[in-house]
């Protein structure tokens, strides 16, 4: 699955444990992961952690990121404030696939309290390996840029 060499992972306090599992999973797949999230479960402000990933992607230091919070909603709002970011809150394989194929998403957002842990790695794999289809989808993306 070596679609991306670098994946950025960030989280707030609610996503710390899931982020740790995700990083281990990605590293086992020989992906380089930069962790710019919290390192414990003490309360932090999610916009600060979303901004870290957004800034790194905008600077082109990494092509793709993963953000994790309790539901993912706040992270989605915070990350999508930039026109260069297409952050997608995904709950299953279909949303992960469409996020990439139709929307060229560059940040996957997961809700630690809402995601089915049995399929979280499948969702990540689908997100990382699906290619943007372009065509009519590109026309639509240009309208919201």
Swiss-Prot record:
InterPro entries, alphabetized: RpiB, RpiB_LacA_LacB, RpiB_LacA_LacB_sf
Pfam families (UniProt xref): LacAB_rpiB
Keywords associated with the record: Isomerase
Keyword Lipid metabolism carried by entry: no
EC number: 5.3.1.-
GO molecular function: intramolecular oxidoreductase activity, interconverting aldoses and ketoses
Isomerase keyword on record: yes
Similarity annotation: Belongs to the LacAB/RpiB family.
Name used for this protein in its record: Putative sugar phosphate isomerase RF_0486
């Amino acid at each position: 699955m070596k679609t991306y060499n670098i994946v950025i992972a960030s989280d707030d306090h609610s996503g710390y444990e899931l982020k740790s599992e995700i990083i281990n999973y990605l590293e086992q797949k020989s992906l380089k992961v930069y962790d710019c999230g919290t390192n414990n479960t003490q309360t932090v402000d999610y916009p600060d952690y979303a901004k870290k990933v957004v800034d790194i992607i905008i600077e082109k230091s990494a092509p793709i990121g993963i953000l994790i919070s309790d539901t993912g909603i706040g992270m989605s709002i915070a990350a999508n404030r930039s026109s260069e970011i297409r952050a997608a809150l995904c709950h299953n394989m279909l949303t992960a696939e469409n996020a990439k194929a139709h929307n060229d998403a560059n940040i996957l957002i997961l809700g630690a309290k809402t995601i089915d842990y049995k399929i979280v790695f499948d969702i990540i794999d689908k997100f990382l390996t699906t290619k943007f289809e372009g065509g009519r989808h590109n026309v639509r993306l240009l309208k919201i840029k």
